[in-house]
Amino acid sequence: MVKTVLILCTGNSCRSQMAEVLVNHDLGPDVRAVSAGTRPQPKVADGAIEALKLGGMSTAGLYPKDVDAVMNEHIDLVVTVCDNAKESCPIFPKPLPAIHMPFHDPHGEPLESFVRVRDEIRARLIPELKQR
């Protein structure tokens, strides 16, 4: 059975989007990631798109989503990737296991910062999810 992981942050424009793509790329088909934000931005950050493309990953169909849009999906685990999302994490219809794994927010920084965060997500989050 496929495990579904919700990756949650505030804007759903940088870290959670990169984490969604990395999890689906590295752990699919056993794990399916979806991402959302507590206050989603209008679009995915250009730096996040570029960092993912540089890593050879598809960015087709990425867009910021409000956590309410995924609230009724089957979720096995919630991963918060920023402190604000942890603090304002919504109450789900059923209790869910959750982990908090914060990453630096590269929004507004050079592409190198996005690449660094992408690599850190891969180095820390992927092994954690493999163990679960």
Model-inferred region functions:
Residues 1-68:
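Conserved active-site segments centered on acidic
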Residues 12, 52, 78-79, 121:
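Conserved small-residue
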Residues 35, 80, 99-102:
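Structural signal for conserved beta-strand scaffold positions within catalytic alpha/beta enzyme cores
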Residues 49, 77-79, 105, 124:
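Alpha-helix boundary/capping detector
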Residues 62, 68-93:
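Mid-chain, well-packed structural core segment of small domains
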Residues 86-132:
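Phosphate-binding/catalytic loops
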